[in-house]
Amino acid sequence: MSRIQQTFAALAEQGRKGLIPFITAGDPDPAKTVEFMHALAAGGADVIELGVPFSDPMADGPVIQRSSERALARGVTLKSVLADVKRFRETDPKTPVVLMGYANPIERMGVDAFAAEAHAAGVDGVLVVDYPPEEAGVFAEKMRAAQIDPIFLLAPTSTDERIADVGKIASGYVYYVSLKGVTGAGNLDVSSIAGKIPAIKSRVPVPVGVGFGIRDAETARAVAEVSDAVVIGSRLVQLLESAAPEGAAAALKTFIAELRAALDGAGKTAR
C-alpha cells in the first residue's frame, strides 16, 4: 500500500476528509520551498501537491502562470524540484508528495529516468496535466512499477467513458476539476459537484479530491461534504505572492490550519 493509499485509508477510518494544498516549487524563493512544505504539513495537510514550473502551463490561470514564470526565472527545474522533495523527506517520512505539472519536462528527462529519480527522492504520486488517460497506460504502468501513484484529472465535461478510462489506470486518488476553464477561476457550485461525484465513484476505485475555485474555509468545508478530499492551490500561491518573506511560512501554516479545522468539522457531520 502506497503512502497516499495509507493516508486515505487512515482518513476514512477516522471519518475525516483529506486536505491537499498545492504550491509551486521555487516560488517565491527556491530556498524556501522545503520550509513551505513543512509548514503545510504542520498546518494539517494530508498530501502536498508540488507544482513543477513549466513555460506553457495551459491549464493554469494567471496566478499560477505568474508563479511558474517566477520560479523558472529563478532557475527551478524538474531536477531541482526532485532535490527539494529529497530534502523534505530527510525530516518528514510520512506526508505524501505529489508532483503536478506537464509532460514536457518529464519527457526531456526520459520517463524511465524520471520514475527512478522520483522514487529515489521520495515522490509518492505524479499528475501530468496534459497526459490524456487513453494515451497514458504505459506511463501509468511505469509509475506504478516505481511505486509512484499515477493521478489523473476529471472535469465536469468528462464523459462516462472517460471516467471509466481513468478508473482503469488511476491510483492514489483522482483530482476532479470542479469548474470548466483554468485554475483559480469562477465560483463554486457545490450542488453540481455533488451531482457528478456518484458517476465518478461508481467507475473509479480510488478517493476523489475536488479542486479549482476553493478559496477559504467555508468553500473547503462545503466541498468536503461531497468529496473525499479538497485541493487548494491558487489561493495559497496568492498568499505567498503577497506575504512578507519572513512571515510566509507561518502564514501558510495558519491558513492550512484553518482549512483543517473546517474539514474536520465537515468530516464529523458526514459520519
UniProtKB/Swiss-Prot annotation:
Q: Which GO terms describe its molecular function?
A: tryptophan synthase activity
Q: Name one GO cellular component term.
A: cytosol
The record's keywords, sorted A to Z, are:
Amino-acid biosynthesis, Aromatic amino acid biosynthesis, Lyase, Tryptophan biosynthesis
Which reactions appear under catalytic activity for this entry?
A: (1S,2R)-1-C-(indol-3-yl)glycerol 3-phosphate + L-serine = D-glyceraldehyde 3-phosphate + L-tryptophan + H2O
What InterPro entries does the record tag this protein with?
A: Aldolase_TIM (IPR013785), RibuloseP-bd_barrel (IPR011060), Trp_synthase_alpha_AS (IPR018204), Trp_synthase_suA (IPR002028)
Task: Indicate yes or no for the key word 4Fe-4S.
Answer: no
The residues responsible for catalysis, as annotated, are E49, D60
Q: What are its E.C. numbers?
A: 4.2.1.20
State whether keyword Nuclease applies.
Answer: no
Cite the annotated pathway: Amino-acid biosynthesis; L-tryptophan biosynthesis; L-tryptophan from chorismate: step 5/5
Highest taxon, organism lineage: Bacteria
Q: Quaternary form?
A: Tetramer of two alpha and two beta chains.
What job does this protein perform?
The alpha subunit is responsible for the aldol cleavage of indoleglycerol phosphate to indole and glyceraldehyde 3-phosphate.
Regarding protein family, the annotation reads:
Belongs to the TrpA family.
Q: What name does the UniProt record give this protein?
A: Tryptophan synthase alpha chain
Q: Which organism is it from?
A: Burkholderia cenocepacia (strain ATCC BAA-245 / DSM 16553 / LMG 16656 / NCTC 13227 / J2315 / CF5610)
UniProt gene name:
trpA
